[in-house]
């Protein structure tokens, strides 16, 4: 199953034809047509049709870029959402309030049937869960160890977790994530690594703070995240740049790969006076993969 490019994943309200039309020119790697939080209760059913029509119309132009965030599996909307939006052109489902990997397996079985009905090749529709939005989910993060069908990445969220536990804020007085959310961030990274998929960082809420977003993305990439959720169209380009390796990083990575290719039996090498061993080779290959 091929990897999707997930540096930037932009939410677009699925009930807004104007915003959907405008999103087609956005540089985000993935557009997430949102049926959950950004759509009012009274408009959810209609938004399904709007989303499905948009996917069908844009299938060729936006190939492998269209996801839908459905409503949580334990709501009355989830199955109807899936039945409406699994059409040719859909690349993936973002699953909010995922409780454990068991939810991914359940969703995957549903997608098996819906792909067959829609004439879509088996396994086409991938899944990105939001894996930290409830206390139960936090305690089940170890369930993502190993290969999971359709899993394309794992992301995390702070807002719903705050509401569940009754936190007044998810930041300390100095503006840093408080310990619970630092844990959620770290568990997302570890779960994604254990599952062999990219970890996608949560959104930067202040869409006017471009400098803060860029700094947060750079720090996130240093920690191991491969992309970030965007809540505003202007964030996509900033996110893409931050999660893409620089020319200097690519050149250094290529030197490491070339050095080991020239001496395949070596356990460690010296480059510019620095000892380089197999973990450095792994990181170099990952860096080159990011630019592919």
Language-model-detected regions and their locations in the chain:
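Expand to "…catalyze enediolate/carbanion chemistry for C-C bond making/breaking, isomerization
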Residues: 1-292
């Amino acid at each position: 199953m091929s990897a999707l490019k997930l540096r930037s994943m932009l939410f677009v309200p699925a009930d807004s034809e104007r915003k959907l039309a405008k999103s087609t020119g956005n540089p985000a790697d993935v557009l997430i047509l949102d049926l959950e939080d950004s759509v009012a209760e009274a408009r959810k059913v209609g938004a399904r049709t709007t989303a499905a029509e948009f996917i069908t119309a844009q299938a060729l132009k936006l190939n492998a870029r269209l996801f839908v965030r459905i409503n949580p599996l334990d709501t009355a909307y989830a199955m109807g959402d899936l039945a409406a939006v699994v059409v040719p052109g859909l690349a993936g489902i973002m699953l909010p309030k995922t409780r454990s990997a068991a939810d991914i397996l359940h969703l995957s079985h549903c997608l098996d049937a819906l792909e067959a009905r829609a004439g879509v090749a088996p396994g086409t529709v991938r899944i990105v869960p939001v894996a930290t939005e409830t206390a139960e989910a936090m305690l089940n993060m170890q369930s993502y160890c190993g290969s999971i069908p359709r899993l394309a990445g794992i992301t995390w969220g702070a807002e719903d977790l705050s509401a569940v536990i009754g936190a007044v804020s998810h930041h300390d007085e100095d503006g840093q994530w408080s310990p619970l959310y630092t844990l959620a961030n770290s568990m997302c990274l570890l779960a994604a690594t254990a599952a062999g998929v990219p970890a996608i960082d949560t959104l930067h809420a202040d869409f006017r703070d471009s400098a803060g977003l860029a700094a947060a993305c750079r720090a996130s990439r240093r920690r191991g995240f491969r992309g970030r959720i965007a809540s505003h169209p202007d964030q996509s380009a900033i996110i893409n740049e931050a999660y893409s390796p620089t020319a200097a990083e690519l050149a250094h990575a290529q030197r490491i790969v070339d050095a080991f290719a020239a001496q395949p039996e070596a356990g460690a090498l010296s480059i510019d006076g620095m000892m380089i061993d197999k973990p450095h080779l792994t990181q170099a290959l990952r860096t080159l993969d990011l630019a592919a």
